[in-house]
Amino acid sequence: MAKAATPKKTAAVNGAGKVTQVIGAVVDVAFEGELPPILNALETQNNGNRLVLEVAQHLGENVVRTIAMDSTEGLVRGQSVADTGAPIEVPVGLETLGRIMNVIGEPVDEAGPIVTAKKRAIHQDAPSYVEQSTEGQILVTGIKVVDLLAPYAKGGKIGLFGGAGVGKTVLIMELINNVAKAHGGYSVFAGVGERTREGNDLYHEMIESNVNKLGGGEGSKAALVYGQMNEPPGARARVALTGLTIAENFRDEGQDVLFFVDNIFRFTQAGSEVSALLGRIPSAVGYQPTLATDMGQMQERITTTNKGSITSVQAIYVPADDLTDPAPATSFAHLDATTVLSRSIAEKGIYPAVDPLDSTSRMLDPMIVGEEHYEVARKVQSTLQRYKSLQDIIAILGMDELSEEDKLTVARARKIERFLSQPFFVAEVFTGSPGKLVALEDTIKGFKGLVNGEYDSLPEAAFYMVGSMEEAIEKAKKLTAEAA
């Protein structure tokens, strides 16, 4: 029986389907023989280009409903369609580093084909319980404010919140750079439904700041996968999975991988467009009824296994600043940490502009990070919180009206604020200051001394844009010498 079934499948592969209906990104295909399974990739030609369709529904009477991964303009009824016999497969491996590809794994950076030893289907099962590693470990980023106050979990998920122009891209590039330096790990960046211009800028900035090499190859640290705003919903709904598949391959080879998604909201938005086109009845606020399932299936694949880890940083757009909107609310359920970038901090010239009071992490637990780290982090936060509550009094009455204790708190808080800044490797090109990667022990030691008053005698300026406390002390000596 099994042998008799084989020719049928070959017939399907050789193109036994025909287009019967095209409505936007949804294409119905009728097959004479065996129907392709759900999620299989079908191929047809459109205006001389390869058009990939993904099977979404079986409608009966040998018709399948598919989602197009590219524009369907120019597609006609009766056109022949071939079943590839497998889901969408994309190239994976070291050859993808430094390159940009689209949802179906085709290069879009005009640097020639991506030739890899193997390909991998974009739909994979999440690792089983046996494969998963449950040990709580911190991923040290070398960025003081992150490591001290909102540490990232290895294999965890981090939400990155911030408006336009507060330094999201620079922070992302620094994380890519530091993970490559400190852990020898690679990164994958999935541009989901964002501006093509920003994607292009990121690509060129990565080359300028030596994160990637032009045309890929030796020395490149990140693979880029784009499905931007101008693309059909099918591509935007699947491009995060394409990026995740490349990251999973690196993880299975024993790497600690960073996986960036910009923007996770667009993944949900594309899913809701596809859902409406497939004729599903919408759920709350017009989102797809399968919102939680779609999000869960993707997020559960991002995890630490016995082989390696995928740590995911996801930029999250909050529509109309409504945190109760189903799309961001569903994302929050999966997050281990949040990094909030604040415009008010960026306005002070403090970069990275991470808000030390708004950013949170479930890893900041004495059982995980240790008693000393936890105590120092909480003292830093309480000092900053006290300073924040005194700012109104300072604005109205001035510093002189404060008690001696409050004056000391304000002085320390201002030093802490400045010490939370640090020069980035990827910004060297623009600032001229060499970047600093700070070890966690040095970060804890420095801030412990600050909150305990060991450095009360040093001027504020000494703490601005330095790495470790030793550098701040050196800078203070220089400033004193210059003043003299």
From Swiss-Prot:
It is an enzyme of class 7 (translocase). Keywords: ATP synthesis, ATP-binding, Cell inner membrane, Cell membrane, CF(1), Hydrogen ion transport, Ion transport, Membrane, Nucleotide-binding, Translocase, Transport. It catalyses: ATP + H2O + 4 H(+)(in) = ADP + phosphate + 5 H(+)(out). ATP binds at residues 162-169. The keyword DNA damage does not apply. Belongs to the ATPase alpha/beta chains family. F-type ATPases have 2 components, CF(1) - the catalytic core - and CF(0) - the membrane proton channel. CF(1) has five subunits: alpha(3), beta(3), gamma(1), delta(1), epsilon(1). CF(0) has three main subunits: a(1), b(2) and c(9-12). The alpha and beta chains form an alternating ring which encloses part of the gamma chain. CF(1) is attached to CF(0) by a central stalk formed by the gamma and epsilon chains, while a peripheral stalk is formed by the delta and b chains. Produces ATP from ADP in the presence of a proton gradient across the membrane. The catalytic sites are hosted primarily by the beta subunits. PANTHER family: ATP SYNTHASE, ATP SYNTHASE SUBUNIT BETA, MITOCHONDRIAL. This is ATP synthase subunit beta. It comes from Agrobacterium fabrum (strain C58 / ATCC 33970). The gene is atpD.
